[in-house]
Regions:
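Short, intrinsically disordered or compositionally biased N-terminal tails of bacterial proteins
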Residues: 1-10
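Cytosolic, long alpha-helical scaffolding segments
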Residues: 9-24, 29, 35-360
Length: 360
């Protein structure tokens, strides 16, 4: 029986709490054997003959996990009971929270006779607009059942993020085009596209919450280590904010159909293209895990303040107050895009700084 005492391991070296030592045994040929802690076997419900997966991490560590955990699709179910007094958006928030927590089947049932029409409509709207991979499999006045059909491995976090970024950038470009052309219809399409970005954002949060509980799934869904989960969560939020700023500008175009002066629009376009370039640089540094590229993106983003000030100086002469307000609103939102790009690059620095250290 191996010593489980955290004070030492028989060699005069102290162990961290929870650590145990095992002796390597040589069986001849090219095989070595090491025993596994009995409690670990029991906790996971393993038995003789079951397979385990061994994954090498770095130069000196191995990760051992039950092979069944690779492909296990845990069917988690939850039921929400609602009363007639419950605001439909109270139900929606609870539904989203359960989606985030990784539940596969969610049933909404009434405490009284039936769900109100307004409650049912909001639930269906949330499923359609927000909960990616979710379908309504049963629908009646006495209850609605949702099932998350998309599998963890069907769409990796990396792939979901790329698609989310693509939509956000497309919204941003269309916003600029609608400003240049004074195209209210195109601005309206930008506003509608925001739901799609939110869907990807919620999906990414759900996948990260599931994966962080099962370390082996991290690599399966495209992540390298648990600490990257927080980084991805923050990056996804920043991209979501980029889309939000595109929506703010588009709504301004819809509400103020009178075009801005051409010379001002050209200056705004130049600033806008620059902010988009910073966003591209920051996200590329993330995909490539490139510390130096992320650092350059941060430095580049600093120039956006001066571009904004230059535009505001150009319109400082007396002019229509509403026009001045609009220009300030638009340039502020463009500046925020560059700032969120800088935030993304800073997260990449934190995720990749270890790569820059000299190995001793």
């Amino acid at each position: 029986m191996e010593n489980n005492n955290s004070e030492g391991n028989g060699n005069g070296k102290s162990l961290l709490q929870g650590e145990e030592t095992r002796k390597l045994q040589y069986t001849g040929g090219s095989s070595y054997i090491v025993s596994l802690p009995k409690k670990w076997i029991q906790d996971l419900g393993l038995k003789q003959g079951d397979h385990v997966v061994i994954l090498r991490q770095g130069n000196s560590m191995l990760q051992i996990a039950p092979a069944s955990k690779r492909v296990a699709r845990e069917q988690r179910e939850a039921t929400i009971e609602v009363s007639k007094e419950n605001n439909p958006y109270f139900i929606a928030r609870k539904l989203i929270a359960l989606y985030f927590l990784g539940f596969n089947v969610i049933t909404i049932v009434p405490k009284e006779d039936r769900l109100l029409v307004e409650q049912r409509e909001v639930i269906k709207s949330i499923v359609r607009r927000v909960l990616m991979g979710t379908e309504i499999i049963a629908d009646s006045a006495t209850g609605i059942t949702l099932q998350v059909l998309i599998n963890l491995l069907d769409l990796s976090v990396d792939a979901a993020f790329k698609r989310m970024l693509l939509i956000a950038k497309s919204m941003y470009r269309d916003t600029l085009l609608s400003l240049q052309e004074n195209n209210v219809e195109l601005a309206g399409e930008v506003v509608k596209s925001d739901d799609e970005v939110d869907r990807f954002s919620f999906y990414i949060v759900r996948q990260l919450k599931i994966a962080i509980k099962n370390e082996h799934l991290l690599k399966e869904i495209g992540l390298e280590e648990p600490r990257n989960c927080l980084g991805y969560r923050l990056i996804a939020k920043s991209v979501e904010r980029v889309a939000d700023h595109a929506v703010v500008i588009s709504k301004d175009i819809i509400e103020n159909p009178h075009p801005l002066k051409k010379d001002i629009v050209e200056k705004i376009a130049s600033m806008s293209y620059f902010a988009l370039q910073v966003l591209d640089d920051a996200c590329l540094s993330m995909f490539k895990r490139d510390y130096e590229a992320a650092d350059k993106a941060i430095e580049k983003a600093r120039k956006i303040d001066e571009m904004e000030k230059a535009i505001l100086r150009a319109v400082s002469k007396p002019r229509d107050v509403n026009e001045l307000y609009r220009i300030k609103l638009i340039t502020e939102n463009i500046r925020r895009v560059a700032e969120y790009a800088s935030d993304i690059a800073e997260i990449v620095l934190n995720m990749t700084v270890q790569q820059t250290l000299r190995k001793g």
